[in-house]
């Protein structure tokens, strides 16, 4: 079908308002062949869920199987770096299919289950208190810099036993790794620099943990135990440690920042949250799920067809690459009533912010916990959160929905 | 003799992560929508079933003592 949507996904409009761009695609051509990137773009809720639950048709081994040129294009001279990057990403456990994926995920799955995560709630509360106490002194904060970033970064670094003075380094490496979702032709440079520096940083730490008996209170030690059971190689342990550090905070940053912005733009919902007048599940739980639906931290994820398969009436050929969009699926009118309305009473809230199927986000419970505690603390502490800017600038990423800053006043 | 369990999976929550199927494959079967169903509640040990419930990432599995009604998980 012909669509009126241009294929460039990095225009200012597509970045600032993915809901219009991908929403239009979803309405006009929900399984769309993007000629510019030689890529299937899947934008509807039901197609997304069907695809993610049919992992035997749509492989997660993207970096191993994708044979086409990088999209968007990169500098010809960086093809060696591109290859280096691919080989690194192939070691991530999320870049595998069954049965390898299951064996590798099992090493850390239990760590992240809902009961295990509850144990971290007091620490999350204490970090939030410290951040907000500091903000109270001036009555202002940049939600991104002063709250949304330090909280999840502190928590994941603490879980993995990283020294506190390394948090700044971890964040600066993460910022370079985020070039993975961007469109600059020279993006391989910062990206591969970060991979190399991260490997150098983590290798001795992993070596140290692997030499000792497993410490069940230390996520890096638990991950390293996968080497002893044969589920992971040393290189895979190091690669997954980088993945956990990155994914363990980047996504939650966006949940807290985007969610806070949504509340400032919808004072009536902020009032409902503050008054807590909703039945079980409570207002905080519902609000967090609605933030995840309304302005989700992750916009899209990739797959590659492992066989010829039909999706939404289109024939997808073996080896074709696919990107599925959470942004548009979460606003699909076939799934959600008044999908463009921010409504924290919505329940059940069947959003796909964490994906679906066997690759459903490992850290979902941690993200939820941090989001719940962050929104709860804001609602308990402040009557008004006022945004001190009229311009909202987002990182030019196809993968993440990340504000650059969010300055607010607090009263 | 092992006590009889009543196991339910909430399909508003189940995302088809299939970790329950991985841990207790004789009990949990994925349906056509790839959501979990506790088809054979007697087919594995209580310990394995509780482990499967505990490792559901979205807390969709509820386990009850079928005779007394006591909630065993969550």
Where are these regions (language model features)?
Chain A
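Cytochrome P450
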Residues: 1-411
């Amino acid at each position: 079908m012909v669509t009126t949507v241009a294929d460039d996904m990095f225009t200012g409009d597509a970045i600032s308002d993915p809901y219009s761009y991908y929403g239009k695609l979803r309405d006009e051509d929900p399984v769309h062949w993007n000629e510019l990137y030689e890529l299937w773009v899947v934008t509807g809720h039901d197609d997304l869920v069907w695809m993610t639950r049919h992992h035997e048709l749509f492989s997660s081994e993207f970096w191993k199987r994708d044979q086409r040129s990088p999209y968007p294009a990169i500098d010809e001279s960086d093809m060696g770096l591109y290859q280096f990057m691919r080989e690194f990403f192939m070691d991530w456990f999320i870049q595998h299919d069954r049965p390898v994926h299951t064996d590798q995920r099992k090493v850390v799955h239990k760590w992240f289950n809902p009961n295990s995560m509850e144990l971290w709630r007091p620490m999350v509360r204490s970090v939030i208190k410290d951040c907000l106490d500091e903000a109270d002194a001036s009555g202002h904060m940049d939600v991104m810099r002063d709250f949304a970033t330090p909280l999840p970064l502190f928590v994941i670094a603490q879980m993995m036993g990283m020294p506190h003075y390394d948090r700044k380094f971890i964040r600066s490496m993460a910022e370079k790794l985020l070039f993975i979702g961007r469109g600059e032709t020279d993006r391989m440079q910062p990206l591969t620099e970060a991979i190399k520096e991260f490997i150098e940083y983590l290798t001795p730490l992993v070596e140290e943990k692997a030499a000792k008996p497993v410490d069940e209170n230390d996520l890096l030690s638990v991950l390293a135990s996968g080497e002893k059971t044969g589920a992971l190689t040393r290189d895979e342990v190091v690669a997954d440690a980088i993945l956990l550090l990155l994914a363990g905070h980047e996504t939650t940053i966006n949940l807290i920042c985007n969610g806070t912005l949504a509340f400032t733009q919808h004072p009536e919902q902020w009032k409902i949250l503050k008054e807590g007048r909703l039945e079980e599940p409570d207002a905080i739980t519902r609000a967090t799920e609605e933030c995840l639906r309304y302005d989700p931290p992750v916009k899209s994820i990739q797959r590659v067809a492992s066989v010829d398969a039909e999706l939404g009436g289109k024939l997808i050929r073996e080896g074709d690459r696919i990107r599925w969009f959470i942004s548009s699926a979460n606003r699909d009118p076939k799934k959600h009533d008044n999908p463009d309305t921010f409504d924290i009473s919505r329940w059940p809230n069947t959003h796909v912010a964490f994906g679906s199927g066997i690759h459903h986000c490992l850290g979902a419970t941690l993200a939820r916990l941090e989001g719940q505690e962050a929104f709860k603390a804001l609602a308990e502490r402040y009557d008004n959160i006022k945004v001190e800017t009229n311009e909202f600038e987002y990182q030019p990423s196809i993968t993440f929905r990340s504000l650059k800053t969010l300055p607010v006043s607090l009263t | 003799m092992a006590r009889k369990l009543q196991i339910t999976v909430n399909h508003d929550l189940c995302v088809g992560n299939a970790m329950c199927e991985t841990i207790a494959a004789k009990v949990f079967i994925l349906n056509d929508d790839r959501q979990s169903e506790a088809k054979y509640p007697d087919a594995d040990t209580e310990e394995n079933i509780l482990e499967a419930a505990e490792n559901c990432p979205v807390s969709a599995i509820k386990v009850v003592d079928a005779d007394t009604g006591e909630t065993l998980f969550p």
